[in-house]
Amino acid sequence: MGREGTLTIATRGSGGPGEVSVAIRGGRETFIAYSDQPISQNANVLIIESNPSRAVRVVEWPQLDP
């Protein structure tokens, strides 16, 4: 929880999950991503809940410019 990621497959809200890619331990891992509202592919998201089955709940999260 609390990590940022990028959606590689859009979520459809209650219509179904998508997929999120997250930087972990010097590499990238993917997780099934659920959201309350649809979120488009390549959107920056924040993980707000995780489950042992490699599924996470995400919300859209604005990416800050450096």
Q: What residues fall within each predicted segment?
A:
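Terminal membrane-proximal soluble interaction domains of membrane-associated proteins
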Residues: 1-66
